């Protein structure tokens, strides 16, 4: 059984199922391994092989639409990353991922302040992706409206080398190499397993000024030290250069969705480079006790040119139109698990999580003067220079109690403490010293009762409290155009109650969940313009909804997947300056989402599949006066798999947006100039070839 070490309190373990009735994956929201059916939380597991099936292997949006409660929107803008939200958490993000916790092989892809990204996830070497929703996600600490955990493949025998290539519309080309293997079976001292993957992605982009280039490498090396301990080394590197097409007004979108007028004018773009390494030590102390220690460190460099005119940048307090920042981050998570009895069987997990980030942030004008006129897209004079520190120390405890044969209790608590410290080194007339600091502390409890109605049907009731601090980026700009950090921004807190049901249907699993989340001091977009966004607290909000999911196997060759999400997310207090927004929908969140796919596949020979995706309209501003229309798109895939000796081959083709629907892929919430809309591409095509050679 393969185990995936997770970074925080829930510690899900992922393994191959032992029977078809247990589905293809088993997970746990507690320290012991149970099936997805028996997990007392809303959790979905996506298999890496399924993600790679007839796919470009570039974006998570290709394969996560089947997860209920998860809204994935592809901006078609590789300078800003995907837009992800779980039950509405993360919807305000104008770039990157916020409100969620993301982990890649136990290393946070979310910084201590809650800012995350998906750009370093290598789909080519993914083993599983686990999506946790609901109250238990709060046990991961700050900004955990939901949790996305990515686990890379563990190498096995025989050694295998794979090559893949995909070419599609808009000059899209993705190609890569991967080597996996093992020495020994992993149970004896000196046994080694390895996975090494590297790939490159280039595209001209669907829109003008949206070309991108991305180099990504991922490696995992495991060494069995002795019969009871193992050491795993993790390495990851990503290098991205991407143009930023920006948003469009409604008239611009209807006139020509491929245009990028401000991208061309300001030469907006973003360069990102990140390298990180991690080391995980696992030891079985006794038959009842296990120890796990995860250490990691990394560096991330970003340079971004924004579409800000010269006039605003001339104000003494303005930070300019170029962001230049370097981040160093590191952390350690130590946990001890004990299995025993206290009147009933119980499992206890206690741990301590420490994360630290140091950021050097500079701002420059995005122009130079040439013959008396501004030439945009060039780095000009320094306008900002500061050092920001952030760190957290979170002790946690989780317990699992088997009260009876049918009734179990999972309960946990985490005490999250987050500190910010900013030192301003750019002090000029009209721009004083804006140094400052802040700290936030919160108890985060969660609990769940699960009852087994039958061997194939479980129901559960769970509740929990979470909180979300402002990220450094959210603190970086004040809405009044003054200099310095926005320390008036407060953390938000939320309370969630959920009831759920999971039923095994032959070789399938049907899941359902009802939930309500009440939030105080919700952090929302105040204004957004030219790539710069300021934030404010919105008072009270409410999210309530329902999720349905079905994964059903028919015979040996047919498979149906379906998901439906209804989410009513509204403001309960006014957040608008000059109009009442009480009762308005929170922007960036679809009220209804639907997905269905049906496919036919054998181990060898032809395979084919189709999918349909639906998203209802999405409000673009707090006043609810602008929205992106609803849409439905259809995709088709087909391919042929065959083997020749020790070589496996897979040739495939796909078409997305089959009926050439014109729609908005994502919205920029509260964009001050009405440039809310980021268009999605029309009908597009791709072909690919995957080759694998086994050294047997």
Predicted regions and their residues:
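Short acidic/polar hinge/loop motifs at secondary-structure boundaries
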Residues: 100, 107-133
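A beta-strand signature from Gram-negative outer-membrane beta-barrel systems
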Residues: 121-164
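Face-selective signature of the C-terminal outer-membrane beta-barrel domain
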Residues: 230-236, 271-427, 450-452, 510-514, ...
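Transmembrane beta-barrel wall of Gram-negative outer-membrane proteins
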Residues: 160, 167-202, 207-245, 269-290, ...
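Membrane-embedded beta-barrel scaffold of Gram-negative outer-membrane proteins
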Residues: 187, 280-284, 290-308, 452, ...
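Gram-negative outer-membrane beta-barrel transporters
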Residues: 335-342, 405, 409, 514-518, ...
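Conserved C-terminal beta-signal and adjacent last beta-strands/turns
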Residues: 180, 236, 461, 497, ...
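Surface-exposed extracellular loop regions of Gram-negative outer-membrane beta-barrel proteins
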Residues: 241-255, 358-365, 419-426, 437, ...
